[in-house]
Structures are given as C-alpha cells and as structure tokens.
C-alpha cells in the first residue's frame, strides 16, 4: 500500500491539508514538498533520527518526509534541558537530529531543515509502506523513574485514528484547530488523523487566548483539542457560545464539575478523554451525554478496547489495565521493564480507576500521585474538586508531604483574589470529607505552575517553594 499522504495527494489533492497564519498547503503541495525533502534525507543514511521541531508547516513537512524516506522519528520535547535531551537521544541510539528551531547540542550530527537541500538526492519511490514499522518514538515524563522510550507503529496510529473517528467523529470537511505541541502524542495524533482521513488542520504555534478566540470566531473551526485549563481560559475570555465548533476534545488532566457545568451552560460540545503516550493518544472518550450522566467519566468500555481493574479494593478501585491495537508492544528503553503487561497481555497504566455498574470508567488519580496516609488512600483530585467548590477559590492543587505519624498527609495550595476564612474552608471540607482526607496545611498562592498548553505541573508543586503568602495549619 502507499503511504497515507500519497493517497490523499492522489484522491484529495486540492483540499487544504495544513493552514497557519502565515501559509497553507494542499495535500498535493504537502506531498510534493515532503517527497522532495525525503529524497535529501536518504543521504543521512539513518534508520532513526531525532526531531527538534515546533507547530509550523516546515515541521509537518519534515515529519512526512521522514516517513516517506522510511526513517523513524524520535520526538524531542523542546522544553527539556540539554542534559535531558542528550540522555533521551542516546537511550534510543540517535546520532542525527534535524531541527526547525535553533539548536546546539554536542555529540550529534545536527542539520537545520533549511540546509537539507544541500545534501545529495536519492529516489524514494521504491519504498514500501509497512504498517508494522515504527513511525514515532516518544518519551514518558519519567516522574516515577527513568524516562521510558515508547515506540509507536503506523498501525498503532491507525487504530488510534479509527477509534477517535468512532467515538468522537470527524470527516473530510473537518477543520481541526490544533495548538498542542506536535512533539507530544496529543498534537501528533491530530496530524495523523488528518492525513488518514483527509481533513484540514489549522495549526497554532503557541496558545494565546486572544489569538485562539479570533481563530474560533473567524474560521469554520469544527474540532479543537485542549486541556481543561485552556478551555477555562478561553471561556473566561469570551468563549461563551460554540460558533462553528462541533467537538471540543479534552484530555491531559481531570475535568472538574464546575468546568463542565460552565461549558454546558455555553452549549459547548465538550468530550472528555483518557489516553497516554503508550496508547497513541485517546483510548477512551466520554460524549457530552455521558458527562451529563456522570461528570467524572472518561467513557465506556467498547468492543474495540478491552479494559479491566487489577486488584480492586472494597470500593472497586484498582489499577486500570487496557488492551487494544493502539497500545504499544513494549518500551524501547528500558527494553525489559517489569510489570509493563500482565499475563493476559493487558498494559498496566499506573492509573487508579473504577468501572461502575453502567460500564463507565472513572479515573481517580495517577498511582504516583496517590497519597497514602495511615494506610488509607487519598485521591488529590477529590480534595481539589471540593476546594474549587468553595466560594472564592479559583484554582487548587493537593499534594502529599511526609509525616512521621501517618507516612503522608495532604496539604492544599489554592488561588483566590478574596479574603478566605480558613476556618470556614476547613469546615467546608469537614462537611464533605472523611477526617483523614482533610488537608493539614493550607497555602494561599498567587498562581499554580502550568505549562504553556495549560497542563498543571504537579511535580513542580512538590519540588518548588510555593509557600508564599498566607498559610495555616489545621
């Protein structure tokens, strides 16, 4: 079979493939540019290269060019330190990195995208497209140990796109506004869905509230991928009606009931999802109707995905295990990692979850974020949700700290522009939580650390001194 981009160029060539504020390419134009760059890339004589790229057209051309040249791409998070980049690339035997952004990194052969045309050209028309080949390599966050290299095959990506089409829905007339970084699976998956289906991606380099609102109001945007915090920023800034939006896909963090209530009040078509780097983006998806029935669900089990709970406790809570064609076959690095899959071939996600009587899947917390106090499990999300329900609190995060008596106890950081009576806040918790779950310390802070795409940096909350301003011990 031919590569998806070649098929779109032949059957859908005049349709816009990629649009930015500066430039646009049809599928035919994208294919010819990518094929030309692929002919130069073969001179590198590399099976696998690193990519240091951003959300722009050159980067999309480069991605497709690598695939046309049968080169695996290892994505580099541009926010990493040089030391982290070097360790990641060395772990998967990368010798050459191609970049569209300025980059200096010792120990590698570096080529800027614009300099590739100085290389010799070789024909790539004889290459055969193989679905079982590795398309991309991405790294997990490594917050629970060494960073893990995740190989994603073309078949993994295809299965993910098919699952998304079934649960979310898209077609060739779809226009998908994408601001999530394409070096992350959430961003790259939009590029892949587009080339598989033949729809248009409107690519945004960086999340800026005013620019995003302008694009939504000006262009016929039908789909959009966000994390919950960026949706909140958009609603606060004036996204109070759907305009042409048909689907807003949320992921990367848990939804609060307050956010869902606000979105539904504005008639925004929000879908919640669960996915990982290891599952090539979303694995489960909750429709607006599902969210109205159960706000905290990430969807239901279906015939295309297999889900089970490992060692459930008395409440039905246990580790979420999943199986499907979009799940990776195993890590490239470390190659032999214990407890990746169970004996039945289910991937062990590390998430604490429940499947209720209606088949709804509810994710409580990452196992690594779980607070264990005196042998009792405490889910930070539950505490954060109740905190945000207290009048005047705009944002909150709960983390565990060491305690000589209980092992760990929860503490709360919250954001407000009002004078909060902390005795009343504690009473609010007492009315909603068992005593062992009530935070033992409270810190009022100006803001919480989020990435540029709106994802809470929980690790920074644990490692940095946010204890500025008012605080109180209960």
Curated annotation (Swiss-Prot):
The keyword Ribonucleoprotein does not apply. GO terms for biological process: fatty acid metabolic process; menaquinone biosynthetic process. It comes from the Bacteria. Its EC number is 6.2.1.26. Gene3D superfamilies: 3.30.300.30, N-terminal domain of ligase-like (3.40.50.12780). Signal peptide: none annotated. Belongs to the ATP-dependent AMP-binding enzyme family. MenE subfamily. HAMAP family: MenE (MF_00731). Converts 2-succinylbenzoate (OSB) to 2-succinylbenzoyl-CoA (OSB-CoA). This is 2-succinylbenzoate--CoA ligase. The gene is menE.
